[in-house]
C-alpha cells in the first residue's frame, strides 16, 4: 500500500547531467575538486572555484542567529573588501564547521588563506561548509584536500564541483544559461546542494553562481536578492533553517559586455531574468531531491491583494504537515488546504476562496483559465465544496508532479512556491542522520 | 529497527480511567450520550451536557479565518446573551460542519434549538462539532441522536461524554479537580478530544470544562484565558490549526461558594490554579494520544528575557520536523535543537546557550539544578558542544518521556511546552485519514 521510495521520481534531477554544454560555461572560471576523507564514503568533499579576473561578489546568508564559522568569515571578508576583488571560493562538505567556537573560526581562516595562497590570489578566499554541526574539521585532511583540489583546476568540470558539495543529496545540481547583452554573450552557471532542512530563507543549502558578465557590485546585489526571493525563498521541504546557508554570485566581467550599472537597463533586466532562471531551476532540483520526498508539488496562489500576502498563504500551505501527508496518500484533502489558508495570518474571506488540484505545474489552472478536466479538478467554489469523483481525484494525485491552485478573490497578485510531500521515508531518513 | 507503535506508551492516557471519583463531579451537571450513526463504527457520536442552574460561560475559539458553523453560532449566542444564562451544550463527532455554507449554519441552529427545547432550557444550547470538514451533517441521524441522548442524562457518566466526542483519539480524555474555597468545596471536570492537528492556538480540539463554582463572567473569562495559555496553547503536535477548535467553561454556582468577582482574590487564584491543572492534564493527554506519536516530549526554556520570548523559542523547537524526527530515532541531535533556537526569531546569543537532554519532564535539569547524571546529560555549554557518550545518550532517549532543556542566558523567564516525536506512523495515519 505504501510506495517504495526507490520507485519514485528520483531520476528526474539527473536529467540535468545530460543537458549542459561545456562551451557555455562562463569564461575565466576554473573548478578543482578532491576527496580528502571528510566524507566516510571517500567521495569528493573539497571544491575550489577560481577566477583569473577579480570578481564582484554578492551573497545572501542564513538569518539563523547561530551562524557557522565560514558564514561569519565570508560576511566579514565581503564587507571589508567592499564586495569586490575576489578570485576564489573554497567549499568543503562533510562538516559544517558550525558551533565550533574560536577554533572553528581559526580553521575557516586557514581554509581561506591556504586557498588564496596556493592560487596566488591577491585577496583571501571566501569559504562555505556543509555537513554535521558541532564537530571540528580535521584540518590535516582539509589542507591536503585543498592542495589536491588546486592541482585539478580546469574550465569544464563543473559537475565534479557540484558533486563535491553534496551531503545527503542523491544527485549533483547544476544549471546554466546564456544571454546576449550589449557587447557580448554572457554565460551563467550555478551549482547547489540541498536535501534536508530546506525552507524559505534558505535552510541547509549552499549555492554558488558564476557569470562572466561585467556588472557593478550594487547591481549584482539587487539581482541576487530578486533571484533568491523567487527561487530559494520560494521552496519548502521541512521548514527548518540551518546555520550555514549561503547563496553567492561571482561576476568576473570576462564576457566583455557593456558594464552594467543601472538596474532599470534592458541588459540588467535580461541578466536578472537569466540568473533567476538558473536559481529557480536549482531550487526546484533541491525540492525534487529532498530527503524522502515522493512528489514535486507546486502551490499557486492567485487573487491575493499583494504578492507578499500571496507568498504568506503559499508558505502556510507548503509547511502544513497534514497537507503534505495527504499528498503522499494521494488524497485530495482540500479541507486541510483551506485550513492552512485560514490560519496563514492573512485576512482572507473564506467565502471567496476557490481551489483546484491538478497534475503538473498548475500553470493553466484557476479562475478564467483553461482548466482542462483531464489534468485538473476544482474542489471549492467560493467557499463551497463541489461534488467530486474521488477515484478521479486520486488518479490525478497519483502523478509525481502535482499542483494546488488557490484563488483568494482579494485582488490581482499571485505567488508560487514549490514543496514536496511528507513521507514515511522522510521520517526514516531524518531520524537516523547522524548515525 | 523501527518500533511498532502498538508497543508504545498508548496505555498511559487510559490510566485516567481508573483515577476519577464520581462523587467529585460538579453538582448540578448531567451528561447524556447516543450513537446516531455519524460514526461508521457505530460508536457514540452525540454528547449533551445539561446544567439544572443557568451557567456563566467563557470560551476561546479557533483563530482560523475559516470557522465552522457551530463556532460561528456559539460565538454569536455567547455575545448576544452576554456570556450567561446557558443551561446546555450539544456536541457531535463524526462531522465538523465546517465549509458547509448556509445549510451548515442552519443545521447548527437546529441542533442548538432542538437540544434546548428537549431540555426545556430557556436559552438556546451552545454547539460544538468535530470530524471531517466539507460534508453536511445527516440531520435525521443527528436529531434522533439528540433525542436519544436526552433520555440518558445522568450525573456520573462523564466518561461516556468523553468517549462520545472522540474522533481519531484512541482513549477518552477526562480530568477533574476539587478545591476548598470560602463557602464551600468546588468541583471541576473537563473532557476533551484531540489527536491530529494540535497546535498552540488549539488546533482540532474541543474541550469543555464544567464547574459548580460561583464566579462572575469577567472572572471566568480571565481564568479561562490564563488556563488555555498554559495548557492547550502550550502543546504542539503538527502545527496545523483547525476550523472547529473550542474551549468552553461552564460555571453554574451550585457549590454555594462565595461568589467570585475579583481576579486578585485568593478564591479566584485558587480556582484558576485548579482549572489550569485540569486543562494542563487534558492538554498533555492530547499530546500522549497524538496520531502516531511514540514519545512525550517536554521542552523547557530557562533564562529567557521574557516569558513570551521563552514561549517563542519553545514553540520553534517543538514545531521542528527535524528535531521531532531525531527524537523518534532516539538521536540526541542538539545541533538541530540549536538551529531551531537560532531561527526562532528571538534575538538570542548563541554563545550563551546551554542545553540538556533528559528523561522524564526535565524538572530538575538546567543551570544551578540537580542534573542527576543518571537522568540527564548536558550537550552544550555556552555555545560549545561537550564531549558525550553517544550510547548513554541513546539510552536516555529510549524512554517514552523525554525532555529538552535550554538555558538562553538572557534573563530569568521560563516557558514550558509539550510535544511529541514525528514518526512514520504519523505520516501513515495522516496520509489516509479520509479513506
Curated annotation (Swiss-Prot), chains A, B:
The active site is at residue 204. SUPFAM superfamilies: DmpA/ArgJ-like (SSF56266). This is Arginine biosynthesis bifunctional protein ArgJ, mitochondrial. It comes from Heterostelium pallidum (strain ATCC 26659 / Pp 5 / PN500) (Cellular slime mold). Coiled coil: none annotated. Pfam families: ArgJ. The keyword Amino-acid biosynthesis applies. Heterodimer of an alpha and a beta chain. Pathway: Amino-acid biosynthesis; L-arginine biosynthesis; L-ornithine and N-acetyl-L-glutamate from L-glutamate and N(2)-acetyl-L-ornithine (cyclic): step 1/1; Amino-acid biosynthesis; L-arginine biosynthesis; N(2)-acetyl-L-ornithine from L-glutamate: step 1/4. The record marks 130-131 as: Involved in the stabilization of negative charge on the oxyanion by the formation of the oxyanion hole. One of its GO terms (molecular function) is glutamate N-acetyltransferase activity. This protein may be expected to contain an N-terminal transit peptide but none has been predicted. Belongs to the ArgJ family. The alpha and beta chains are autoproteolytically processed from a single precursor protein within the mitochondrion. Substrate binds at residues 167, 193, 204, 291, 430, 435. It is found in: Mitochondrion matrix. Keywords: Acyltransferase, Amino-acid biosynthesis, Arginine biosynthesis, Autocatalytic cleavage, Mitochondrion, Multifunctional enzyme, Transferase.
Amino acid at each position: 500500500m505504501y510506495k517504495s521510495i526507490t520507485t519514485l521520481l528520483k531520476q528526474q534531477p539527473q536529467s540535468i547531467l545530460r543537458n549542459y554544454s561545456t562551451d557555455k560555461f562562463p569564461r575565466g572560471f576554473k573548478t578543482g575538486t578532491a576527496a580528502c576523507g571528510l566524507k566516510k564514503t571517500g567521495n569528493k568533499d573539497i571544491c575550489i572555484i577560481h577566477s583569473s579576473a577579480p570578481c564582484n561578489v554578492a551573497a545572501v546568508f542564513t538569518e539563523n542567529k547561530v551562524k557557522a564559522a565560514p558564514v561569519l568569515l565570508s560576511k566579514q571578508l565581503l564587507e571589508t573588501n567592499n564586495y569586490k576583488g575576489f578570485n576564489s571560493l573554497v567549499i568543503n562538505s562533510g562538516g559544517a564547521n558550525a558551533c565550533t567556537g574560536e577554533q572553528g573560526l581559526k580553521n575557516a581562516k586557514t581554509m581561506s588563506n591556504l586557498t588564496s595562497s596556493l592560487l596566488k590570489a591577491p585577496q583571501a578566499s571566501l569559504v562555505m561548509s556543509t555537513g554535521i554541526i558541532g564537530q571540528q574539521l580535521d584540518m590535516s585532511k582539509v589542507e591536503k584536500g585543498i592542495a589536491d583540489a588546486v592541482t585539478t583546476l580546469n574550465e569544464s568540470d563543473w559537475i565534479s564541483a557540484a558533486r563535491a558539495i553534496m551531503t545527503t543529496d542523491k544527485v549533483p545540481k547544476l544549471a546554466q544559461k546564456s544571454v546576449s547583452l550589449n557587447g557580448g554573450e554572457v554565460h551563467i552557471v550555478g551549482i547547489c546542494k540541498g536535501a534536508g532542512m530546506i525552507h524559505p530563507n534558505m535552510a541547509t543549502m549552499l549555492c554558488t553562481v558564476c557569470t562572466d558578465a561585467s556588472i557593478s557590485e550594487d547591481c549584482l546585489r539587487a539581482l541576487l536578492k530578486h533571484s533568491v526571493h523567487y527561487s530559494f525563498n520560494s521552496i519548502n521541504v521541512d521548514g527548518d533553517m540551518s546555520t550555514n546557508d549561503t547563496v553567492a554570485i561571482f561576476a568576473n566581467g570576462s564576457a566583455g559586455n557593456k558594464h552594467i550599472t543601472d538596474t532599470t537597463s534592458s541588459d540588467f533586466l535580461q541578466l536578472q531574468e537569466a540568473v533567476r532562471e538558473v536559481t529557480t531551476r536549482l531550487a526546484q532540483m533541491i525540492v525534487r531531491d529532498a530527503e524522502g520526498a515522493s512528489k514535486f508539488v507546486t502551490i499557486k496562489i492567485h487573487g491575493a491583494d499583494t504578492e507578499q500576502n500571496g507568498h504568506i498563504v503559499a508558505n502556510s500551505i507548503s509547511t502544513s504537515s497534514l497537507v503534505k501527508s495527504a499528498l503522499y496518500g494521494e488524497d485530495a484533502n482540500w479541507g486541510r488546504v483551506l485550513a492552512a489558508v485560514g490560519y496563514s495570518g492573512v485576512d482572507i474571506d473564506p467565502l471567496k476562496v476557490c481551489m483546484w488540484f491538478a497534475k503538473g505545474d498548475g500553470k493553466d489552472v484557476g479562475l478564467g483559465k483553461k482548466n482542462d478536466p483531464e489534468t485538473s479538478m476544482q474542489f471549492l467554489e467560493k467557499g463551497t465544496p463541489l461534488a467530486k469523483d474521488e477515484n478521479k481525484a486520486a488518479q490525478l494525485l497519483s502523478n509525481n508532479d502535482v499542483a494546488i491552485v488557490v484563488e483568494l478573490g482579494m485582488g490581482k497578485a499571485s505567488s508560487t512556491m514549490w514543496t514536496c510531500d511528507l513521507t514515511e521515508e522522510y521520517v526514516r531518513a531524518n531520524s537516523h542522520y547522524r548515525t
